[in-house]
Amino acid sequence: MTTDRSSQPSHPFDARTRLFLDRPQSRKWSLHPGRIGAWVAEMDFGVAPEIAEALHRAIDDENLGYLSPPQAAELGDATAEWMQDEYGWAVDPERVHPVSDVMAALGVAVQEYAPAGSPVIVPTPAYMPFLTYLPAIGHPVIEVSGVEIDGRWQHDLQRIDEAFAAGARTLVLCNPHNPTGTIVGREELEAIAEIVERHGGRVFADEIHAPLRYDGAPFVPYASVSAATAAHTVTGTSASKAWNIPGLKTAQLITSNDADQQLYKRFGFAVQHGAATLGVVASTAAYRAGKPWLTEVIAYLDGSRHELARLVNEHLPGAVYRVPEATYIGWIDTSALGIPGPPAEFFREQAGVVLTEGRLLGRGAEGHVRVVFATPRPILEEAFVAMGDAVRRAGLRV
């Protein structure tokens, strides 16, 4: 029986229309005018009022100069408080370093803490820039496809072991995982740590999506697992995804042992210089005062991740989507639809919906698309109705 969704209560986010979102200030919506943007990992829900107020105060106070040590220290305190309160991870605030973004933190992890030119293991599917940025700075990528066990994406531990044995020195560990939305649990983290330790390797832990978890799912920061993981890990995180402030260009690089901290002091100024003052102001406000807004957003996204399952089943029957445990990213296998050529290109041109092409996320991801569902649900439905119509018009398998 079909549910009459017209009688269901709406949310204020649902009132945000395409006309409102389709503005030149938005890369997500302006790069492909007239099409629905579901490709950039940012939300269409605005920003927490506490963050907006902090930014207005900073502007009123003419706080637009270079980042000051007290501001950096305050961000360190706020980040450490968040890590302790949310994950039980005791972080020394002095080991929280402002950087421009998580990619900058990754660059530090491989260029300063790993041998020059050493290969880096990237489990796939992966955040697209991991696969292009690392070779660009002289570190070859070894792609290791994940495996599906009981309907969940997991790391292929045997192949990670083999990649370290073949000469890799660093593993990129994205948790929660982008794009599958899997939260890597303690047992799997411990298994990864055993492999890394046995080979004398290192880990870059990208934990940017950690605040965006559903059903109260626990999250274990990799560096907190043991003394061994703390000794071989650089962590990159940011308020940018959970609080929707990516354009403010601020992230946090966290060192978790004395040796890494001492080394960072030798080059850290140049890296910290890339962090934006307003981004630090906004991030501090997010960690200290932004939880009520985040809680509301997660509740809305929780409904949307399940709504996406309905939309895929109704409009793209045969496509495979598994409801993510975290993030606002959906990973959809469209292989069974028989789309000729790259599916994201098909949906962009035939349905007016802009997604991310699976093949850009690594070998073996052909036939998939990545969809960002952090948009008003009426727009999400409009997108999948259009996608289903495009598949039917093309005479494909629906």
Q: Language-model features: where?
A:
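PLP-dependent enzyme catalytic core of the Aspartate aminotransferase-like
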Residues: 81, 346-355, 361-398
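N-terminal small-domain helix-loop-helix segment of the aminotransferase-like
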Residues: 2-101, 108, 288-289, 394-397
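Conserved core of the PLP fold type I
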Residues: 64-194, 211-212, 217-228, 234, ...
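Conserved core segment of the aminotransferase class I/II
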Residues: 55, 227-302, 391
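A non-catalytic, amphipathic alpha-helix used as a structural packing/dimerization or gating element
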Residues: 74, 78, 259, 263-266, ...
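Conserved glycine-rich beta-strand-loop-beta hairpin in the small C-terminal domain of fold type I
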Residues: 284, 301-309, 321-334
